[in-house]
């Protein structure tokens, strides 16, 4: 480790990642931009992972390794983030791999665009052993605007492992929030967007690993609820409404219905929470999360809600599209969408 302040800090939370962590670390050390530090906080891993990390830290002084007692993902991420000294700070998960020019590209963009708080990029996908997985690329020319009060709320989303932001922006967010730990990357993007623009570049900057621990149906369901509630937290923040009480009641992986009801009451007529909730279930093909037996049951609920509520033209067009989609896909379940 060196006392010199680096240009860029990369932070990583590690937990029992012996099969992948060396590839992740080496991808940072091999960056074309070499003025960096890699802050790794290990979350109480066993010997195989720690042996690898200790060896790597001995071999390269740019690594700052902290061995911690088990504290969970959010606590470990925040501990690593707090140790970063660079004026620009990037994240990488312990099972993903940076492309060699990832940091150089993102630093160049942030230096050329002072109004941008954070920047991300696209990902290539691989399986547990590193084999490429073909994925449909999103249109890089499609512009998504940041609009928390739109219907539905619109977000420039940057996947966690591709994210780089200014240290000042990171500090202003207060870090990752544990109540949204199943969708912490979405929540942090909402928070960063309050500090400046968030930009998603069309360049592939990271290889993202897909394996059993991030593909399970239970993980998918928890992520969906967390994404929904994080967007409502962003709506509340945009409206200047304190949602601390509602957020403090969120039980990750538990019963989310009280939290949905809490935001419904908190936002009242300021935002159509019930309409958004039904729309979200339809768009995500996740009716079971709302207690509906199938897509047809959700479609019936949407129709009843539609008849009982006045509509403006733009919202009606969006809503009818979701309704038609739900009716066509009525036989699907959330498990098939996981």
Predicted regions and their residues:
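Short, acidic, metal-binding catalytic loop of nucleotide-sugar glycosyltransferases
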Residues: 26-35
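Conserved donor NDP-sugar-binding/catalytic core segment of glycosyltransferases
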Residues: 101-134
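Short aromatic/hydrophobic "clamp" motif used to bind/position activated sugar donors
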Residues: 89
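Glycine-rich, basic loop-to-helix element that forms the pyrophosphate-binding segment
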Residues: 67-84, 105
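Conserved nucleotide-sugar donor-binding catalytic segment
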Residues: 10, 82, 99, 121, ...
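C-terminal subregions of glycosyltransferases and related glycan-biosynthesis enzymes
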Residues: 210-338
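A conserved acidic beta->alpha catalytic loop
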Residues: 27, 42-51, 70-71, 93
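Acidic helix N-cap motif at the loop->helix transition within catalytic regions
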Residues: 20-22, 47-55, 77, 97, ...
């Amino acid at each position: 480790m060196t006392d010199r302040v680096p240009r860029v800090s990369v932070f990583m939370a590690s937990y029992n990642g012996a099969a992948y962590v060396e590839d992740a670390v080496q991808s940072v050390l091999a960056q074309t931009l070499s003025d960096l530090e890699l802050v790794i906080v290990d979350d109480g891993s066993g010997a195989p992972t720690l042996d690898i990390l200790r060896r790597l830290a001995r071999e390269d002084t740019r690594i700052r390794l902290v061995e911690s007692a088990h504290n969970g993902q959010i606590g470990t991420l925040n501990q690593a983030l707090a140790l970063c000294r660079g004026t620009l700070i990037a994240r990488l998960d312990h099972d993903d791999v940076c492309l060699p020019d990832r940091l150089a590209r993102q630093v160049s963009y942030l230096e050329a665009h002072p109004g941008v708080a954070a920047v991300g990029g696209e990902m290539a996908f691989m399986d547990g052993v590193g084999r490429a997985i073909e994925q449909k690329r999103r249109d890089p020319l499609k512009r998504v605007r940041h609009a928390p009060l739109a219907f539905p709320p619109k977000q420039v989303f940057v996947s966690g492992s591709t994210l780089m932001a200014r240290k000042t922006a990171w500090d202003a967010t207060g870090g990752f929030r544990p109540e949204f730990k199943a969708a912490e990357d979405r929540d942090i993007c909402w928070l960063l967007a309050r500090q400046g623009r968030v930009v998603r570049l069309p360049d592939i900057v990271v290889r993202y690993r897909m394996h059993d621990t991030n593909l399970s149906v239970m993980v998918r369901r928890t992520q969906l609820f967390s994404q929904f509630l994080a967007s409502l937290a962003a709506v509340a923040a945009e409206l200047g409404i304190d949602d601390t009480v509602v957020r403090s009641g969120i039980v990750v992986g538990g019963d989310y219905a009280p939290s949905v009801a809490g935001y419904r009451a908190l936002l009242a007529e300021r935002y159509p929470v019930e309409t958004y909730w039904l729309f979200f279930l339809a768009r995500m093909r996740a009716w079971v999360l709302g207690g509906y037996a199938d897509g047809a049951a959700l479609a019936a609920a949407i129709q009843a809600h539609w008849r009982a509520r006045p509509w403006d033209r733009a919202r009606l067009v969006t809503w009818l599209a979701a309704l038609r989609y739900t009716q066509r896909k009525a036989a699907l379940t959330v498990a098939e969408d996981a």
